[in-house]
Every structure is written in structure tokens, then in C-alpha cells.
Amino acid sequence: FTEGDEGKVFLNEKNITNSQPFSIARQGMVRTFQLTKVFDRMTVIENMMFSGSNTKNDSLFRSLMKLSTQKNNENLIREKAFEIMKDLNIDHMADSYARELSGGQKKLLELGRSIINDPKILLLDEPLAGVNPKLAEEILAIIQKLSDQGITIIMVEHNIEAVMKISERVVVLAEGSVIADGNPEKVRKDPKVIEAYLGSGNE
């Protein structure tokens, strides 16, 4: 990742600026990627359970050992994985290999993997990139539902209309600088945003 030039990042009043990704995840912040990072040689359910085994209180190795030795723990993770997959409409693909999924379905799988450990903050990197309009609407509805459940969502997205539709606060960047920051209605009317992204027809 690119290191910041200045400033610090705090999570629950703790400085996490230089923390390792696994440490940040255990504190309740997880992320998805624009280019999905699913395990192509695993099935959909295996992808979900692998992520579900990485709990806050155990090392990854210890979690995997538990997964292989404690049937009860495995069943609990499997049940939770199926609940999430059902919400994401990918439960019918549980036994399919991740490499067989479309790009949009991989987006859903990665989203499911990110929420199986009940994060407090979810960072989404271009969740709608390369997704057809119908699936984009489904993903937006899922994101809204997660927000309604109390998960803080921080989303990087170039589909500005989608951003305006579900966001409480919008920060707009152009050429590396902040050009607007506020609620969607305020940002939509900002002259700099109109010039950079919306075009004169939206004035």
C-alpha cells in the first residue's frame, strides 16, 4: 500500500497508522478490493469458512487448527456462512469453485467474506466497478442494509450517482485534493463537483 505523507489514523482512540492489516482486522476494520482477492481453487463455502475461522481472539494458525478439530465450531461457522450467502443470493453456488464465478459474483463473495466476522468498519474499494446495473442495485441495497445494522461504511466509488443515493457524507477528490465535503445535497450542488464530475447539465 502507498504510505501517507502525513497525519495519523485512529480506530477506537488507538493509533493504527503503522499497524499490520491482520491487527487492524482484529480490531474490527476490514476491507474489500476493487480487484477481488478470492481463493479461486476453493469453493464458495470454503472461501467463506476460511474467512470465518480467522477470529479476533485467535491467530490464523490456531483458528484453522480449531476448524479442523472441533466439529461444533465448524458447524457454527458453516451455518453463519450460509446465512450470509443466502442474503447475498450466492448460497446456490456454495459448492462451486470461486474461479467459476462471474466478476459480479466474486464481488458478492468478497463482500460476504468481509462481514462474516462482524466488522465495525467496512472499507469498500470500488464495489460497483465492472458490475452490471442490476447487480449494482443489489450491491447498493446490501451496503445500505449493512449500514442500517450499525456497520460504518467507508466507500471509494466513481459512480457518483450511486454514492449520492446511499451516503450520509460525501468527500469528493480531484487530482489528489479534496474539492467538496458534506451531505449529498450540498455536494451535488457544489460548482467544483459539477465541473469535475457531473457536467453543466446537472446545474
Which functions belong to the PLM regions below?
Residues 97-101:
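Conserved ABC ATPase signature
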